[in-house]
């Protein structure tokens, strides 16, 4: 996230990092990167050591599912998938700790700082990585279920039926969503029908967002970061975001995805984003840079040509 989170006690966060991971850490510097979680660089004597993440619990994860995703990533890394950049296990024996201790709203995790990392110069590196990931022996991980709730259209109608006046961008977001409501409802009907055809026996290990924004080049190789989204799911969960691809990509990946599954996850992404952004912008907000990004994200999803 771009905004420094005022609800995160950075003194408590530093104490948690020192207690659970590295007692030599003496400073945290907020990093305005990514979207959806909060990040800090942890340093000791001026040298960067760790990338600290604080995840908000409640919408995509509860404490148990987040821990399952991270601990599953650690297990997969230990089993040979060393291209996963995974959290460091805390002294508690878990990958996450609550902030503050005993709470259920925020979870802290720590990964090694990649000081030499850069983004790939060209897309496509994920093909071979996903072939290995999807072919891996499954470990305990969260299991896919429709991200978009069955109450989605009713909830949206209820939300649109009242003013969004708890923040400066609310009414603009409500007008935008209202103008696209019928198409969103059609998308959901198609999505729900496709979701009913999914067979859990065909699930594989998936990353969730393996595109170039979650790839880093370090030590001469590409690694996948942001493993909180790991899940057992249809392989197309990872492929819809990079589709379409060329023959060379498919040759490196090793198989051809199902068009109906690609469509399912294309719709799931858009509807899930619409759900999250409308919840966000119909509630209390200040017009911060993150709020502006959320409004832009909502507009981009609603204006997609999905048929």
Which residue ranges define each predicted feature?
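Juxta-kinase regulatory segment immediately upstream of eukaryotic protein kinase catalytic domains
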Residues: 1-28
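ATP-binding glycine-rich phosphate-binding loop
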Residues: 23-43
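Protein kinase catalytic-loop region centered on the HRD/HxD motif
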Residues: 197-204
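Active-site Asp-x-Gly
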Residues: 204-205, 216-264
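Catalytic-loop signature of eukaryotic-like protein kinases
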Residues: 209, 213-215
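ATP-binding pocket architecture of kinase catalytic cores
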Residues: 43-145
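A cross-family kinase active-site recognition segment
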Residues: 118-179
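ATP/Mg2+ or Mg2+-diphosphate-binding catalytic cores
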Residues: 2, 165-166, 275-307
